[in-house]
């Protein structure tokens, strides 16, 4: 990867990191204050995205280093390892989310009706992440970077997660008898994102 490609890749991931930090804080704060477990789960996923972005930045930096005695074939494998780390983090998130959702459904705990403010946040996150998916995917194709493609796929996963959170909040708010949909959405998110993580892990 030459200097120009490395710089463009780094800028792409740096922008992604900034957005994820903002969205993680917003989702978690609104999710907790507005009683939306689905949005909280989406916020936790954004925290995982932050770790993934940091790993991607490290991977891009190390992959750019020249060959040396310890790495006669260059450092490009660090980029691949960073991509694998992203997918591994997604899988860990899915396991935690599945456990939380299942335990909530089994215990039958009372869940408060989420407020509509959570729906607005989920909707905004959906639009933002889909825009970033399209941007990151084009950059990945242009630069021929597997790491950036993994990062782009994570943006798409985020967009779908936010969409499901949006649906869960709206349904639970207007139909209180279906308030448990928050936990069902948690299971759906865990399954879908788990499959995505496995796909990225296999490359």
Predicted regions, residues:
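Alpha-helical transmembrane cores and adjacent cytosolic helix/loop segments
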Residues: 1-203
């Amino acid at each position: 990867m030459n200097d120009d490609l490395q710089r463009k890749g780094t800028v792409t991931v740096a922008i992604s990191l900034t957005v994820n930090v903002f969205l993680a804080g917003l989702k978690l704060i609104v999710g907790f204050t507005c009683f939306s477990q689905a949005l909280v789960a989406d916020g936790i996923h954004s925290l995982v995205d932050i770790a993934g972005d940091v790993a991607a930045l490290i991977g891009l930096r190390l992959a750019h280093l020249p060959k040396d005695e310890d790495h006669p074939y260059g450092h490009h494998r660090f980029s691949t390892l960073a991509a694998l780390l992203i997918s591994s983090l997604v899988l860990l998130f899915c396991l935690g989310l599945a456990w939380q959702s299942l335990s909530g459904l089994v215990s039958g705990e009372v869940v408060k009706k989420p407020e509509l403010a959570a729906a607005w946040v989920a909707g905004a996150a959906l639009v933002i992440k889909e825009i970033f998916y399209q941007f990151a995917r084009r950059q990945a194709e242009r630069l021929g970077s597997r790491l950036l493609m993994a990062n782009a796929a994570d943006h798409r996963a985020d967009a779908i997660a936010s969409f499901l959170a949006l649906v869960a909040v709206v349904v639970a708010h207007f139909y209180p008898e279906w308030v448990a949909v928050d936990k069902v959405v948690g299971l759906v998110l865990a399954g879908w994102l788990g499959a995505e993580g496995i796909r990225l892990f296999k490359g």
